[in-house]
């Protein structure tokens, strides 16, 4: 099964927030100043990069979406540099010029890969009339599919509630990367995207997954949010929505060099994907993949459609990820030629929890490749009842495919995967629970082919049914 990229070329997104210019001066140091005990830097390279809300807009434009940027600037060289640089990457700027204030600029002096000093040129925009910002939002609402509010607490978003109200009245989702601990100002937003530190600063330290979910759901209720996405660095990200099961997506980063601007990439991809007509769950999947790409780059970076496509399709195209039966047979044949031991397991995996993750990791350790066969929606309904599955097949497979322990994910329509197993004939068939080996579907076929069958224990205290019951109980309070 292939995962298609969103139609970014049809997506329109407006970003409103704190715009700033990042300046970098590089050069060698070879002596100490006679005027003071400080190094003398002979500047030989100057770089200018859009920062803050401008970096979010660049991330949206880099995907091929229509990005509009609104913010407050001075009338100065920094504002002109921002406009020029952003125009070159197809970001449409509609700045509100404030003659009494400088454009927010952060100047960094670096030598030998060390930052020696940072100079900030800024005055708070808190007292500036927000009406011109409201007018620009109103003018764009008919042609955008999402509004991003990028808050760096520099004064552009003193009237957040008015902005949220304007967008919601027009049916446009509002995504906010929050700043500080006053989430009351974001009341009524469609989606907040705090990182774990920001989340815990408001909700309190979370000692377990259940506690994070419980406190996140309380924030959603307290501030009338439609959803909350907590980004958790190497632990991936967790999406929470009222009356829905938590969706946890493991990180896809292979190497982490720099997390600078990763939050801008996440909210930019989320907004562009939603504006293209995709679901929030799909938007989180693409944002998670993009974050895995951008943290592998040095400095503030963006993600191109090709890079995103490689991130979400690369595993399948090179023999990994979500597959059709035919693709799986070819991948298994190639693995056997390389002398690799193929392990196979199956299940519904409706709400992925710690027990599932631990079980799959243990199964993967038993061989070189792990296949996970997943019950289709119809098969799950017959097995678990009319209220299941909670998460549709495609989403269940996408999340499983993102796990480091899982190599291949395939679906089956029957009540058991016996036919599928007979066609694959893994070297080791694994099942979790209280089964006897001879009771496991496909065991006879695997034994007849000289393979092994094994039962692994599930982690105690983890149950999809219990999670669903807890969510239902909480929603009834």
UniProtKB/Swiss-Prot annotation:
Keyword Nucleotidyltransferase: yes
InterPro entries: Bifunc_HldE, Carboh/pur_kinase_PfkB_CS, Cyt_trans-like, PfkB_dom, RfaE_dom_I, RfaE_dom_II, Ribokinase-like, Rossmann-like_a/b/a_fold
Active site annotation, chain numbering: 264
Keyword Disulfide bond annotated: no
Reaction(s) catalysed by this chain's protein: D-glycero-beta-D-manno-heptose 7-phosphate + ATP = D-glycero-beta-D-manno-heptose 1,7-bisphosphate + ADP + H(+); D-glycero-beta-D-manno-heptose 1-phosphate + ATP + H(+) = ADP-D-glycero-beta-D-manno-heptose + diphosphate
NCBIfam families noted in UniProt: cyt_tran_rel (TIGR00125), PRK11316.1 (NF008454), rfaE_dom_I (TIGR02198), rfaE_dom_II (TIGR02199)
Subunit architecture: Homodimer.
Broad enzyme group: transferase
Region of interest: Ribokinase: 1-318
Its EC number(s): 2.7.1.167, 2.7.7.70
Keyword annotations from UniProtKB, A to Z: ATP-binding, Carbohydrate metabolism, Kinase, Lipopolysaccharide biosynthesis, Multifunctional enzyme, Nucleotide-binding, Nucleotidyltransferase, Transferase
Database matches in SUPFAM superfamilies: Nucleotidylyl transferase, Ribokinase-like
HAMAP family to which the protein is assigned, alphabetical: HldE
Official protein name in the record: Bifunctional protein HldE
Cellular component terms per the entry's GO annotation: cytosol
Function, as annotated: Catalyzes the ADP transfer from ATP to D-glycero-beta-D-manno-heptose 1-phosphate, yielding ADP-D-glycero-beta-D-manno-heptose.
Gene3D superfamilies: 3.40.1190.20, HUPs
Pathway(s): Nucleotide-sugar biosynthesis; ADP-L-glycero-beta-D-manno-heptose biosynthesis; ADP-L-glycero-beta-D-manno-heptose from D-glycero-beta-D-manno-heptose 7-phosphate: step 1/4; Nucleotide-sugar biosynthesis; ADP-L-glycero-beta-D-manno-heptose biosynthesis; ADP-L-glycero-beta-D-manno-heptose from D-glycero-beta-D-manno-heptose 7-phosphate: step 3/4; Bacterial outer membrane biogenesis; LPS core biosynthesis
Binding site for ATP: 195-198
GO molecular function: ATP binding; heptose 7-phosphate kinase activity; heptose-1-phosphate adenylyltransferase activity; phosphotransferase activity, alcohol group as acceptor
GO biological process: ADP-L-glycero-beta-D-manno-heptose biosynthetic process; lipopolysaccharide core region biosynthetic process
Family label: In the N-terminal section; belongs to the carbohydrate kinase PfkB family. In the C-terminal section; belongs to the cytidylyltransferase family.
Region (Cytidylyltransferase): 344-477
Segment forming the signal sequence: none
């Amino acid at each position: 099964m292939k995962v298609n990229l969103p139609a970014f070329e049809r997506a329109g997104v407006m970003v409103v927030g704190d715009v700033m210019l990042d300046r970098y001066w590089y050069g060698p140091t070879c002596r100490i100043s006679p005027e003071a005990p400080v190094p003398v830097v002979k500047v030989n390279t100057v770089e200018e990069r859009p920062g803050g809300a401008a970096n979010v807009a660049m991330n949206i434009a880099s995907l091929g979406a229509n990005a509009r940027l609104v913010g407050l600037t001075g009338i100065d060289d920094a504002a002109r540099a921002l406009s020029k640089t952003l125009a070159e990457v197809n970001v449409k700027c509609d700045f509100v010029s404030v003659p009494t204030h400088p454009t927010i600029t952060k100047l960094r002096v670096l030598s030998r890969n060390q930052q020696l000093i940072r100079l900030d040129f800024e005055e708070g925009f808190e007292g500036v009339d927000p009406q011109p910002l409201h007018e620009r939002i109103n003018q764009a609402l008919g042609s955008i599919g999402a509004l991003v509010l990028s808050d760096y607490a520099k004064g552009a978003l003193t009237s957040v509630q008015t902005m949220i109200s304007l967008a919601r009245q027009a049916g446009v989702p509002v995504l906010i990367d929050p700043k500080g601990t006053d989430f009351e100002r974001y009341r009524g937003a469609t989606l907040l995207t705090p990182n774990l530190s920001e989340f815990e600063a408001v909700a309190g330290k979370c000692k377990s997954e259940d506690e994070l979910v419980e406190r996140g759901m309380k924030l959603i209720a307290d501030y009338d949010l439609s959803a909350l996405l907590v980004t958790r660095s190497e632990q991936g990200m967790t999406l929470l929505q009222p009356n829905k099961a938590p969706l946890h997506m493991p990180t896809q980063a292979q190497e982490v060099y720099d997390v600078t601007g990763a939050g801008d990439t996440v909210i930019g991809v989320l907004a562009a994907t939603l504006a293209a007509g995709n679901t929030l769950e799909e938007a989180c999947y693409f944002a998670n993949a993009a974050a895995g790409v951008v943290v592998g780059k040095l400095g503030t970076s963006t993600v191109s459609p090709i890079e995103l496509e490689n991130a979400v399709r690369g595993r399948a195209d090179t023999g990994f990820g979500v597959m059709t039966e035919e693709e799986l047979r070819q991948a298994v044949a190639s693995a056997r030629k390389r002398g690799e031991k193929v392990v196979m397991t199956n299940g519904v995996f409706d709400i992925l929890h710690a027990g599932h993750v631990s079980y799959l990791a243990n199964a993967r350790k038993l061989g070189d490749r792990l296949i996970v066969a997943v019950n289709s929606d119809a098969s799950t309904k017959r097995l678990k009842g009319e209220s299941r599955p909670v998460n549709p097949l495609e989403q269940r497979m996408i999340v499983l495919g993102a796990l480091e322990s899982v190599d291949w994910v395939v679906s089956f329509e029957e009540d058991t995967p016996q036919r599928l197993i007979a066609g694959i004939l893994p070297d080791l068939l694994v099942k979790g629970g209280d089964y006897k080996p001879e009771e496991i579907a496909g065991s006879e076929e695997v034994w007849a082919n000289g393979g092994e069958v094994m039962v692994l224990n599930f982690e105690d205290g983890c149950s999809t049914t219990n999670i669903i019951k807890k969510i239902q109980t909480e929603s009834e309070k």
